[in-house]
Regions:
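Membrane-embedded alpha-helical bundles that constitute the cytochrome b-like, heme-associated redox core
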Residues: 1-166
Length: 166
């Protein structure tokens, strides 16, 4: 159940972050900019904290690696491709590219899902960093200014932030 709660928090936060992000970039409603920016920053913190909580939970909360079983392991173990399903990566890629009709058999998570479970927390952290580097109250802090200089300025940081949304 805790995993379901973090999943729904992520979903709601991401949808509202996309909506407020578009309204910040394309202001379509007069007088809404302050609200949009405030909600955007708040939800960025919510998403980041929820991501950290979810990663910590992966090491301490157990779940079933297969459907319909009582055997439980700590959740991070289901995120890693195991030796018994690592060979299925090609089959999963063919399935998702519509070259293969049959769904590859697997455990709780398929190999592409496992890779995304490893990548998404990293991407959320990078997105949070780029967001704080673009936010006026923190953009001049040395930690964020150095990153902005490293990528070539605020416009490059903004492009990275936009790209991470997709």
């Amino acid at each position: 159940m805790p995993f379901v709660i973090t999943h729904w928090i992520n979903l709601v936060a991401m949808i509202l972050l996309i909506i407020t992000g578009f309204s910040i970039h394309f202001p379509f409603w007069g007088g809404f900019m302050g609200i949009a920016r405030g909600v955007h920053v708040f939800l960025g913190f919510v998403l980041f904290i929820n991501c950290i909580v979810r990663v910590i939970m992966a090491f301490f909360v157990k779940s079933a690696p297969d459907g319909g079983t009582r055997y439980q392991v700590t959740d991070y173990k289901t995120w890693l491709p195991q030796a018994d399903n690592r060979h299925q990566l090609g089959a999963w890629i063919r399935y998702y590219l519509f070259f293969k009709k049959d769904h590859p058999l697997g455990a709780k998570l398929g190999v592409p899902q496992k890779i995304s479970y490893l990548a998404i927390p990293i991407l959320i952290i990078v997105m949070f960093y780029t967001g704080l580097a673009l936010w006026a109250p923190t953009m001049n802090w040395a930690f964020f200014a150095a990153g902005t200089d490293l990528v070539g300025g605020l416009m490059s940081m903004r492009i990275i932030h936009y790209f991470m949304m997709y």
